[in-house]
Amino acid sequence: KGAAVMPHALINNVKLKLGEKGELLKEYVQWLSQRVQKLRNDENYMPVFHIDVYGTIGAIFGVDNYPAMADYLAELEEAAKPFHLRIEGPMDAEEREKQMLCLKGLREEVDRRGINVELVADEWCNTLEDVKYFADNKAGHMAQIKTPDLGGINNIVEAVLYCKEKGFGAYQGGTCNETDRSAQVCVNCAMATKPDQILAKPGMGVDEGYMIVYNEMERILALRKARK
């Protein structure tokens, strides 16, 4: 299908998914890189690896232990090569201000050391106000804009545009537990505002969400062409 961003596994358990020293996720990223290189039909196909870790990296290294977390992110960067890596929710500091400070601190450490891994704000970044707060403080490199949490398409649009204005990555996300209609509405918002990426939804089987979202994109383009 040539998806621009690879769907991620659920890295939501230290013992079973991340590994006590992060070894399981590292092995998974290496496997994913090797598999894409083996199966792709075109060497120019370079998808982004976007992996939500549900705060587990902070759980093993410490939510504000930036040097240790950055060391591990550098290992993941190497494992993902030649593909670009995004890590969503590296830590969960259990309250909004501390989460912002931790993501800001980790971004500064990663950027200072030239580690080519993007950090995506997830935990404690839910409402339009939250998105602006994280973007203003450069807490991470990108925000997941959780479409159901924002309360209206006006807020979804404003959140994406605000992130772009601030030079902060905009990931128009949401949840797999949505409907085909909400996904179609979100696609229209995304086609208008141009976030960096959009979640293929609903469902966790990949194909159904990808088809619903991609078909709506094609429908918008076809209608636009017909009206010219």
Go through each PLM region and give its residues.
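Catalytic core of soluble alpha/beta enzymes
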Residues: 4-6, 13-192, 197-216
